[in-house]
């Protein structure tokens, strides 16, 4: 089955890639979850639009990624969240909140899909997250979670 990926699928490809997969995998997993759509002749326009959107979000090159990395790692980023009396949060800090705090602190827009949180952040204090800026460049950002 020939599919066009609409989101990144680990081990398969990036958005806009045309891939060949087994029928059951495509029909039962990728298409229902919105990770891919069936390939058609008119789908080439979709591929072009997905690749154009991805290129606009992507970091230009390795040097630009290094510049963004130095900006992000320069100082800790404060994230304000609602917390209870014992310092426990109501929920967890989301990647959307982290991306917003990074944009406010550094002035650089970071795609939330590039932020990797190894363990859910559910308490106040200092935490670390990594941001994959380029295939070869990732930044480790210090977060200070403070009560709002």
Curated annotation (Swiss-Prot):
GO annotation, cellular component aspect: ribonucleoprotein complex; ribosome
Organism: Nocardioides sp. (strain ATCC BAA-499 / JS614)
Gene Ontology molecular function, alphabetical: rRNA binding; structural constituent of ribosome
Family named by the database record: Belongs to the bacterial ribosomal protein bL9 family.
PANTHER family referenced in this protein's UniProt entry, alphabetically: 50S RIBOSOMAL PROTEIN L9
Secreted is among the record's keywords: no
Pfam family, any one: Ribosomal_L9_C
Keywords linked to the UniProt accession: Ribonucleoprotein, Ribosomal protein, RNA-binding, rRNA-binding
Protein name: Large ribosomal subunit protein bL9
InterPro entries referenced in this protein's UniProt entry, alphabetically: Ribosomal_bL9, Ribosomal_bL9/RNase_H1_N, Ribosomal_bL9_bac/chp, Ribosomal_bL9_C, Ribosomal_bL9_C_sf, Ribosomal_bL9_N, Ribosomal_bL9_N_sf
């Amino acid at each position: 089955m020939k599919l066009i990926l609409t989101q990144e699928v680990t081990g398969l490809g990036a958005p806009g890639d045309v891939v060949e997969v087994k029928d059951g995998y495509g029909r039962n997993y990728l298409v229902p979850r919105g990770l891919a759509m069936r390939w058609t002749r008119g789908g080439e326009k979709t591929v072009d639009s997905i690749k154009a959107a991805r290129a606009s979000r992507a970091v230009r090159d390795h040097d630009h990624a290094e510049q963004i990395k130095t900006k992000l790692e320069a100082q800790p980023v404060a994230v304000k969240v609602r917390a209870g009396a014992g310092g426990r949060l109501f929920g967890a800090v989301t990647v959307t909140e982290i991306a917003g705090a990074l944009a406010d602190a550094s002035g650089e827009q970071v795609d939330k899909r590039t932020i990797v949180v190894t363990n859910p952040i559910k308490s106040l204090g200092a935490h670390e997250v990594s941001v994959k800026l380029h295939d070869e460049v990732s930044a480790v950002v210090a977060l200070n979670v403070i009560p709002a």
